[in-house]
Amino acid sequence: MSRTLLPLSLTATLMGGVAFADVPRVAADIGPVYSLVARVMEGVGAPDLIMQQGASPHEYSLRPSEAQALQDADLVFWVGADLSPWLAGEIETLASDALATQLIEAVGTIVLEPREGALFEKHDPAGQDEGHDDHAEDAHDHDDHAAEDNDEHAHGKRDPHAWLSPNNAMTWLNVIAGQLSAADPDNAGAYFANAAAGRAEIEATVAEVNA
């Protein structure tokens, strides 16, 4: 069974003692998650984005290059099956040896009830081409996620768009740093420092918006 289906706490337990000789290959499902992972990895490496910009995460067919990135990954960070149920099977098939983390299951994540008529479907991989300074905006700006298939939502009893909460984005930065540090202890200091800087950037953005 792929580790992607395990709760985050158990995945972390299984990960104990596992370290890679080089900087791990990392895959992220959508733009906002990519942006958070890229912020944590800044100066060390860069993740691969699984789904192209503007695609709906609810139904998607991987391009060959995206499937290869998933297959090559040592770690996979994705929102979870609530958002992309199809991706569970792809990870099971292509990345069965990867350590996959469903961020929506992370301790401290605030999950809301489904929101009717919400417009969330454009997932922009902020910073993919030029740095990653826009990741804080991914965490709170609903306008960056315009609808493409608003009438096709078939979510369960909770809203899978958890990255829109700045608090969740900050929680996930910590989770990402922890998982990367366990896989790559030599760069743990950089991962945690980057996560702290990312949290500070989000806090500053929220304060500016609320001012």
Outline where the language-model segments fall.
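Gram-negative bacterial Sec-dependent N-terminal signal peptides
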Residues: S2-A21
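Extracytoplasmic metal-acquisition and chelation regions
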Residues: F20-A211
